[in-house]
Amino acid sequence: MGKSLIQQRRGKGSPTFRSPSHRFRGAVKYIPLNYTQDKTLRGVVEEIMHDPGRTAPVARVRFENGMEKLIIAPEGLLVGQEIYIGPDAPIAIGNTLPLAKIPEGTYVYNIEGIPGDGGKYVRAGGTYALVVSREKDKVIVQLPSGELKAFNPNCRATIGVVAGGGRLEKPLVKAGKAYYKYKARNRFWPTPRGVKMNAVNHPFGGKEHHPGKPTTTSRRAPPGRKVGHIAARRTGRRK
């Protein structure tokens, strides 16, 4: 009898394939909208920390109403710096305002998709979006991919560029560095190819390092055989 495929083991959800969220700093969300809809809150940056769960550092901020929140740190943020969140916050790095209040040409990040959802877009290290234009019922923002997306004017965003940029410029060079990179998030690495496995481990294993059978597979194949081009309409080069 053959052994379980990697995707079968992953689907079972053993600790090998689970993200170690107990090591992460916590959720990064804006203060609920009802606290800042009509007034602006002042906060002080107490600490800037590394977060194994994301590519950007996070900052712990204590606000004047006693709430303590984690925010994604922008480039240039300092411990002890005052930041503001609300409709009347000044246009400065680290401050959070509705998109309707942010001028065109401003770099922003951590943009809400729906007013009050806490921030969904542009959160990775070194990324930023650009406010392109403002209209009565929408604000056009250019995302890091180059896509122009329309947002509700009441969606909040933070001014600045996410810290942690340039992390991909230094090459890994050796496998040991990659090992620790993936270990931080418990990624299953390295991932062997099926044709390099023994026949007991994979339908394409054994033989002479080639599948030995068609790689197209039925959509209704059982889990241990469902590998390769699943329900493919066609394979190979277009002619």
Swiss-Prot record:
Signal peptide bounds: none
Subunit-level organization: Part of the 50S ribosomal subunit. Forms a bridge to the 30S subunit in the 70S ribosome.
Basic residues bias locations: 222-239
Pfam family name, one: Ribosomal_L2_C
Function: One of the primary rRNA binding proteins. Required for association of the 30S and 50S subunits to form the 70S ribosome, for tRNA binding and peptide bond formation. It has been suggested to have peptidyltransferase activity; this is somewhat controversial. Makes several contacts with the 16S rRNA in the 70S ribosome.
Disordered: annotated segments: 203-239
SMART domains cross-referenced by the UniProt entry: Ribosomal_L2, Ribosomal_L2_C
Record's GO cellular component terms: cytosolic large ribosomal subunit
Domain of life of the native organism: Archaea
HAMAP family xref list: Ribosomal_uL2_A (MF_01320_A)
Family: Belongs to the universal ribosomal protein uL2 family.
GO molecular function term, any single one: structural constituent of ribosome
Keyword entries, A-Z: Ribonucleoprotein, Ribosomal protein, RNA-binding, rRNA-binding
The encoding gene: rpl2
Name of protein: Large ribosomal subunit protein uL2
Protein's GO biological process: cytoplasmic translation
